Amino acid sequence: MTTTIDIPRIFTISESEHRIHNPFTAEKYATLGRVLRLQAGAQILDLGSGSGEMLCTWARDHAIGGLGIDMSPLFTAQAKQRAAALGVSDRVTFLHSDAAGYAAERQYDVAACIGATWIAGGVAGTVAQLALSLKPGGMLLIGEPWWRKVPATEEEARACGVSAVADLLPLPALVASFGELGYDIVEMVLADREGWDRYEAAKWLTMRRWLQAHPDDEFAVEVRAELNAAPLRHVTYTREYFGWGVFALMQK
């Protein structure tokens, strides 16, 4: 029996109405696309592409092309629908696959992993993986959380939803780490608390409506538990402790 590659079901449910699966807003992605000075015809590889909003809107606004890979069948289908809706299906392609270890057969002008650096065990591994698919002189995009406020204890870190304080860095240390990997940061765009609100709070209505529509589903207990806990966790921890941003890198 073959098992379909997928993300945990709680995310498939809670983020099923999201176009963007991170704390960026449409405006932040528009800003990022503008400040990167993308050239028409540039080709972008996006590992962990979610519902494809970055590639689709940049294809519309900047005439880029590209490939997005995501392990969620639902999000991949949504990305294809979004490309069709924006009239860019001829420029961008979306594949349902595991991005871990993926190395493209061709080289890209931009190689991105926005909020999914777990695919290669963290930032350093993801930078190394993306570099395999990058043209000489090309640009990497890394989307990564960082500590806005460093937890005082390991218990506090776990309450934030990470396993240890060491899982994330404060922003200055994260920025320094890119240099230590041999890269210049050539641009960055940071999320704000409004972006976190849009990412997290949008899940609550989705979960509530799912519960109303699926009261007898065996997964309803887990969704109910998440809905009970999520709002207070967000305003107590996520909103206060986490920063997030996309960093553009070029090899020194």
Regions found by a protein language model. Give the residues of each.
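Conserved alpha-helix/loop element of class I SAM-dependent methyltransferases that forms part
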Residues: 22-40
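Class I SAM-dependent methyltransferase "Motif I" SAM/SAH-binding loop
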Residues: 48-52
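Class I SAM-dependent methyltransferase SAM/SAH-binding core
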Residues: 53-100
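A short acidic, Gly/Pro-enriched loop at the edge of an enzyme's catalytic core
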Residues: 101-111
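A short SAM/SAH-binding and catalytic strip from SAM-dependent methyltransferases
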Residues: 110-123
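A short glycine-rich, Lys/Arg-flanked "PGG" loop and its adjoining helix->strand segment in the class I
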Residues: 124-139
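Short, glycine-/aromatic-enriched active-site segment of Class I SAM-dependent methyltransferases
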Residues: 145-165
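Conserved Class I S-adenosyl-L-methionine
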Residues: 189-252
